[in-house]
Regions:
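Short amphipathic alpha-helical heptad-repeat segments
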Residues: 2-13, 32
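Charged, low-complexity interaction regions
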Residues: 15-28
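N-terminal intrinsically disordered, low-complexity, charge/repeat-rich segments that act as generic
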Residues: 30-57
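Extracellular glycan-recognition/adhesion modules and their associated mucin-like linkers
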Residues: 50, 55-59, 142-148
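Active-site nucleophilic cysteine motif
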Residues: 54-72, 104-112, 151
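Surface-exposed patches in mature extracellular/periplasmic domains of secreted proteins
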Residues: 74-85, 89-92, 128-132
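...with weaker cross-activation on analogous glycine-rich loops/strands in unrelated enzymes
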Residues: 95-170
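Active-site or metal-binding loop neighborhoods of secreted/extracellular toxin and effector enzymes
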Residues: 161-209
């Protein structure tokens, strides 16, 4: 798909949901949202910069923030006013695995499997690395943390080399020092992730330089 076609389809999904508040099921909204994110990944988006007031993350959690995933207001409002689906949460959740339609289990091995599956679904390449290592593939780093049996957390490296995170859905965006333990969370792994457009830019640079 070309850039203009992607923008048109993204806009259509938002308009469709905005015009059909209360008429769309939660299951259909999640299906549209997954499609939205996969298309969004094809846009010319650079590696992240720190901006504590970025509206892109207003309806998202730490996972959305780490992967730079938007949650447009139309999706959020449609979900909160959707036709009832008893097998889905009442609030719009972004658990690890939701993009690849996998159930989230709060075990490190399951979280890792789900994370890899989500990244694969979005066309994002990932390379295991360390917090202090340089990025060898043109991407940026994310780190997964885990509080045993209770919760997960993500932080990300911004383009200035510093790290930041968002604590849950209502938390603010803040700087954070990466370490083996953050608050009550223990480090599970760190990946350098490379999105489709970054790979495209790197290929172009390699050919033209």
């Amino acid at each position: 798909m070309i850039y203009e076609e992607i923008l048109r389809e993204l806009a259509y999904m938002r308009i469709y949901l905005g015009k059909n508040i209360g008429k769309v099921s939660r299951k259909e909204i999640y299906k549209l949202y997954r499609r939205y994110l996969k298309l969004y990944m094809l846009l010319p988006i650079k590696n992240p910069k720190f901006d504590k007031n970025n509206p892109l993350y207003f309806n998202g959690n730490c996972y959305c923030y780490a992967l730079m995933l938007p949650t447009p207001k139309e999706f959020y409002d449609a979900y909160m006013n959707a036709c009832d689906d008893v097998d889905l949460p009442l609030s719009f959740h972004h658990d690890v695995g939701f993009i690849s339609e996998k159930k989230c289990f709060l075990k490190p091995s399951k979280l890792l499997d789900n994370l890899k599956s989500d990244l694969d679904s979005l066309g994002i390449y990932y390379y295991e690395t360390d917090i202090d290592s340089i990025n060898n593939h043109g991407g940026y780093k994310i780190s997964l943390y885990y509080n045993y049996g209770e919760d997960f957390h993500f932080i990300r490296e911004d383009s200035d080399g510093k790290w930041s995170h968002k604590m849950g859905y209502s938390g603010s965006i803040e700087r954070v020092e990466p370490s083996e333990r953050i608050f009550k969370y223990n480090l599970v792994t760190t990946y350098e992730i490379v999105k489709p457009n970054i790979r495209k830019l790197l290929r172009w640079a390699k050919v033209n330089c």
